[in-house]
């Protein structure tokens, strides 16, 4: 892959690298799924925002630098090369923010985007329900109009970041008697609202990365409706496209992991079979392929093209790629992967954490089975049955 960067983009890369060298934490922060780790990651978001590094492709008036997506990819490459912290604000800045920019009113943009950029408001997702996980159109949580408020009643589950976050974006049913994709609306809800209860859900490592949310007649101002009333399915699909497509998982994240995998292999190759080396090569090649495909896609977007089914293909590729990469690391380490500290620990258990998270990749952001169905129907033209 040969990419010709402009002189401005080359200088931008130097600026990012120098800033991160000075400001990025020297040690890994605690898990953002703990209160301590969440607070420290929020402070890091504020550090990024202070010098407008948190969202370089956002408009200047909302806390960004007004740069293009190629510059964002450059930033991501330097960010992950510096081993900077994961973005606790990702639900907001990568998923909700572009949705607000597309569907929100000017008042909503001015109200929600600046505190999102600054790290003052951290957002959670509130989509899935006990009987509406992958089948999001089966949502039953309802929001009944009462004057200038909606009254929300129902339950959400697997709400990422909801244990410690400030706000959530929720898909609810606003039209009585509606079914499936019709009659849904997307509304923005403060998580400290009266009548809203959070119940943490422990992950494999014991940390509460998700929460159940119970809405008992929670009153939400009508101005928190994002997009058209009863037209929330299209708004939600736009957000899902951002989640599956370009923004949530940049190639740099996986390239950095692949570089660490190569280093890990070199340190242990004397006791490994040649087949493991081939797996490492494949993992590294996959990340480079994903990077090339992403640059190509970004170039098309900047030329005015829209993306649709590419988001599903993207999600399929990065989730399977991540799982293969981390499974290869586990093969190299064997039982040592279980150790988080001590003389025999490798990278403080980081690979094990990454492996457990990679197992969820084919599930969140729409299961890979659903993505394959989308591609089969919309790209290949195959029948639904």
Question: Model-found features: residue ranges?
Answer:
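Glycine-rich phosphate/cofactor-binding loops in nucleotide/flavin-utilizing enzymes
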Residues: 2, 70, 74-75, 95, ...
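Glycine-rich beta->alpha junctions and the first turn(s) of the following alpha-helix
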Residues: 3, 7, 196-292, 361, ...
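C-terminal helix-coil-helix/basic helical segment that borders enzyme active sites and/or dimer interfaces
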Residues: 28-35, 266, 270, 274-277, ...
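Internal helix-loop-helix
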Residues: 49-110, 114-120, 161-167, 287, ...
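A short, Trp-centered hydrophobic/proline-enriched beta-strand micro-motif
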Residues: 119-127, 171
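Glycine-rich phosphate/pyrophosphate-binding beta-alpha loops
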Residues: 132, 157-162, 204-205, 360-367
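A structural signal for short hydrophobic beta-strand segments in well-ordered beta-sheet cores
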Residues: 141-144
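A short core secondary-structure module
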Residues: 148-149, 153-199
């Amino acid at each position: 892959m040969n990419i010709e960067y402009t002189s401005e983009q080359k200088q931008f890369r130097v600026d990012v690298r120098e800033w991160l060298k000075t400001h990025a934490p020297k040690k890994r922060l605690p898990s953002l799924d703990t209160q301590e780790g969440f607070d420290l990651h929020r402070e890091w978001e504020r550090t990024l925002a202070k010098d407008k590094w948190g969202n370089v492709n956002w408009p200047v008036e909302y806390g960004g630098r007004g740069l293009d997506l190629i510059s964002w990819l450059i930033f991501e490459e330097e960010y992950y090369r510096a081993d900077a912290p994961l973005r606790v604000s990702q639900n907001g800045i990568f998923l909700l923010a572009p949705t607000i920019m597309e569907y929100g009113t000017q008042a909503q943009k001015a109200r929600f985007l600046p505190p999102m950029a600054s790290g003052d408001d951290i957002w959670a997702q509130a989509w899935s329900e006990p009987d509406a996980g992958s089948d999001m159109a089966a949502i039953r949580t309802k929001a009944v109009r009462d004057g200038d408020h909606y009254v929300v009643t129902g339950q959400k589950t697997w709400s990422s970041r909801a244990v410690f976050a400030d706000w959530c974006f929720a898909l609810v049913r606003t039209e009585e008697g509606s079914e499936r994709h019709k009659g849904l609306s997307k509304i923005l809800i403060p998580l400290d609202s009266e009548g809203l209860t959070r119940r943490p859900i422990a992950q494999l490592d014991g940390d509460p990365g998700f929460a159940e949310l119970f809405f008992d007649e929670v009153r939400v101002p009508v101005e928190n409706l994002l997009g058209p009333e009863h037209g929330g399915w299209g708004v939600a699909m736009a957000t899902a496209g951002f989640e599956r497509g370009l923004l949530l998982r940049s190639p740099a994240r996986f390239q950095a992991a692949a570089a660490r995998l190569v280093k890990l292999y070199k340190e242990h190759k004397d006791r490994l079979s040649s087949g493991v080396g081939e797996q490492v090569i494949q993992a590294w090649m996959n990340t480079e392929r994903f990077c090339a495909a992403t640059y190509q896609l970004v170039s098309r977007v900047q030329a005015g093209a829209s993306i649709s089914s590419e988001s599903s293909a993207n999600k399929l590729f990065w989730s399977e790629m991540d799982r293969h990469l981390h499974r290869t690391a586990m093969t190299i380490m064997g039982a040592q992967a279980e150790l988080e500290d001590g003389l025999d620990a490798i990278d403080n258990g980081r690979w094990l954490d990454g492996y457990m998270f990679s197992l969820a990749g084919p599930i969140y952001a729409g299961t890979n089975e659903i993505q394959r169905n989308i591609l089969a129907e919309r790209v290949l033209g195959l029948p639904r049955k």
